Amino acid sequence: METLESELTCPICLELLEDPLLLPCAHSLCFNCAHRILVSHCATNEPVESINAFQCPTCRHVITLSQRGLDGLKRNVTLQNIIDRFQKASVSGPNSPSETRRERAFDANTMSSAEKVLCQFCDQDPAQDAVKTCVTCEVSYCDECLKATHPNKKPFTGHRLIEPIPDSHIRGLMCLEHEDEKVNMYCVTDDQLICALCKLVGRHRDHQVAALSERYDKLKQNLESNLTNLIKRNTELETLLAKLIQTCQHVEVNASRQEAKLTEECDLLIEIIQQRRQIIGTKIKEGKVIRLRKLAQQIANCKQCIERSASLISQAEHSLKENDHARFLQTAKNITERVSMATASSQVLIPEINLNDTFDTFALDFSREKKLLECLDYLTAPNPPTIREELCTASYDTITVHWTSDDEFSVVSYELQYTIFTGQANVVSLCNSADSWMIVPNIKQNHYTVHGLQSGTKYIFMVKAINQAGSRSSEPGKLKTNSQPFKLDPKSAHRKLKVSHDNLTVERDESSSKKSHTPERFTSQGSYGVAGNVFIDSGRHYWEVVISGSTWYAIGLAYKSAPKHEWIGKNSASWALCRCNNNWVVRHNSKEIPIEPAPHLRRVGILLDYDNGSIAFYDALNSIHLYTFDVALAQPVCPTFTVWNKCLTIITGLPIPDHLDCTEQLP
């Protein structure tokens, strides 16, 4: 039935054909729909009868009309009969095919007239009845709100006002350009709902259109996707909001705790000040009492001496008035002795008096304490420490790091972090990656020695100063361990070689005493060799060999399994740089490659990178690269030396030179 109904549907109104016209192209069209097409082609004040042609909406064939116009076209009576029978066979009810569009229009008008439409803009409760619905705004207004929102001036004069419509979505089903037409397609170009007339004869006829179902599915899918994202984002925001609220609560609790702590600490300071005030005040009172008591005693003594002296002075003055010589002589001697005794005794009775002890030297100076009180503030994280690279020391497996801090008194502890440095580009990434660092916590001093490091390796160090308020880290400092130190092994030396100078020098010595045979000793007549006393199986190592006049020697490395009766480099288990008078070669597995070092090569540097499989030789004094063996080392290797004349001296345990301590760029 649905397939049959689609065949009986008008391409313009999308309803069952009513009074169908049979077009010359064999398609059918409602009479009223054909008339609307002609009306849409008319210019202003132009009669419909003046239009003599139009296009079939189905096949776009041009239909030419006679003088009779649409009446000149035949009625499709057969099709009308089929439609009538189809309507009778269908189930009657709302929206059924048997229900004509006039009946549905009547029912819609009845429903519209019966249903009350309220103003959607009113602030009143309840809202007033709407008098108009603005199709442009898609809002129904009462008279008062309409006047307030749609004054008689542009752009509001262009708004389309219609009678109030109960449901706002109904107005979206009607075409804005053709008021009596329902929208049944979507203009993709203008992103707008349109009717069939808009596509046939309107401004959308050359636009890209799509079926409503297609656009519906696409927009619905897009809306669902956006809605999912919005819901997800909203959930994230709700989680964030909960965390923000929790953070606010923590701020409130912590602030209250800190305020209470501040009051408690200030009360303690005030209590200490009051205690010190009482103690110092007591000292002042005691000092005052002691001084006043001493001064009172001195005053009493002075008064007593003055009283005694006054009586004696009176008697002496009375005696001096005596004119009778005999009487004067009788009393003068006694008085003179008493005056002399009183003068002498006054010096004894009157103690030494310090008139400067007026308590003015008792000074109070709280300027330092005042400055400290003025600086009272909440605790902040300590300043970043500074690594003192010039004070740091290293061995082949340890590094001692020294640092300083501007505010040591506020630091509770230090934390030392370190990791292997693999290139300048990785410093930032390493600083941001906590997993890459070895950490030594709870250091109380300004230095620390790290043990168990790889020899000949550069490390990055950072020091973190910590207190209750937080922590701050120093700038990264780069320090490196020295190479593995070693000496020559006398037990491995050929019997015609002499090892001396603390086993650091080897020289040809025909007069050497007979040495006992050992498995590790070089024995061949031409292989005058000696090995180092270490076997290296990891890390980077650098040592130098001083050429002391020798013109025939070989310097290199060998596996423990290398034959002791062959020259180094003559087998697959050894690698060597050799000089035979004026011929310079590098040799491995009996293959020789000539090289051209400086004419007077005095010191050879050897850089072994075991993990990356390289053995490099350098002119150590001139920092010139000579040659590099690239080899995957499978066993521990031992430094090995051969000398046929004069002597060689080794210098080991050196740090790798800076110009070599990077990714090598070989010529």
From Swiss-Prot:
This is E3 ubiquitin-protein ligase Midline-1. GO terms for cellular component: cytoplasm; microtubule. Residues 499-520 have a biased composition (Basic and acidic residues). Pfam families: ANCHR-like_BBOX (PF22586), COS (PF18568), fn3 (PF00041), SPRY (PF00622), zf-B_box (PF00643), zf-RING_UBOX (PF13445). Homodimer or heterodimer with MID2. Interacts with IGBP1. It comes from the Eukaryota. Its main location: cytoplasm. InterPro entries: B30.2/SPRY, B30.2/SPRY_sf, Bbox_C, Butyrophylin_SPRY, ConA-like_dom_sf, COS_domain, E3_ligase_FN3/SPRY, FN3_dom. The keyword Calcium does not apply. GO terms for biological process: regulation of microtubule cytoskeleton organization. Residues 205-264 form a coiled coil. Zn(2+) 1 binds at C119, C122, C142, C145. Residues 381-484 form the Fibronectin type-III domain. Its EC number is 2.3.2.27. Residues 471-524 are annotated as: Disordered. It catalyses: S-ubiquitinyl-[E2 ubiquitin-conjugating enzyme]-L-cysteine + [acceptor protein]-L-lysine = [E2 ubiquitin-conjugating enzyme]-L-cysteine + N(6)-ubiquitinyl-[acceptor protein]-L-lysine. Has E3 ubiquitin ligase activity towards IGBP1, promoting its monoubiquitination, which results in deprotection of the catalytic subunit of protein phosphatase PP2A, and its subsequent degradation by polyubiquitination. Residues 320-379 form the COS domain. It is found in: Cytoplasm; Cytoplasm, Cytoskeleton. CDD domains: Bbox1_MID1_C-I, Bbox2_MID1_C-I, FN3, SPRY_PRY_TRIM18.
